[in-house]
Amino acid sequence: MTSVASKKPRTKRSKNPDGRMSLGSHLIELRNRLFKSAIAIVVACIAGWFVSEWVFESLKAPISEVAASQGKEAILNFPTIAGAFDLRLQIALTVGLVLASPVWLYQIWAFLVPGLTRKEMKYGLGFILTAIPLFFAGCAAGWFVFPHIVELLTSFTGSDAASFLDAKIYYEFVLKLVLVVGIAFVLPVFLVLLNFLGVLSGMLILKSWRLAIMAIVLFTAVATPAADPISMFLLAIPIIFLFFLACGIAILHDRRVAKRQLVFDGSPSDLPA
């Protein structure tokens, strides 16, 4: 006697029109993005090792030129046996992060894009394309004022005294100065982004201009610990200019949004001439 097995009705796979991913899928995606970023950073760090000596000589050039102008010689010291090796590793890591930045920045962007709306994607892409050139411009400005800071700091050393410079501390000082100024140049872009997202209005940003200028001056004073007026002004002026430029862009954006809202709420004939 043959028995016919009851067949269970096939369940169709549920469609996901919103494009949402499960937690496990997110973790797998994150793992893949991190793995690709790590490979790019490791390869770039290996390349950075071969140029680390050239980078160190380039970083040493400003203080050597200042010392030569004063009839002195600048010598960077390594207080430990492995100090020179550790410094080259640190330089290689920094160079590797910079060289691999297009890869790991893209991986971050590719991970975030599926969860963004079209509007957020447009604003985010505009922010990235604007922030990256400004960041490198800020780094260049920090490198430009660095010799002035070195010259002023070393001028406090008497003629009968000598400065023993720790190479690692010197490198970290240069790196922090360049990065801090680079980040400062990007801050106005954050203001524009917050305005486009509807968090801050253009007039609200403009009304805080006195506080902003005071904060910028204090920031440049901290970024240039020598308290050199020339260096402070060289850093403060472009940041202040970028702040007011951000205010102008935000105000223009608010006006465009207001006009669109008027057209949406009423007919064109209702608009003022």
Residue ranges and their predicted role:
Residues 1-273:
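Membrane topogenic/interface segments and analogous intrinsically disordered interaction regions
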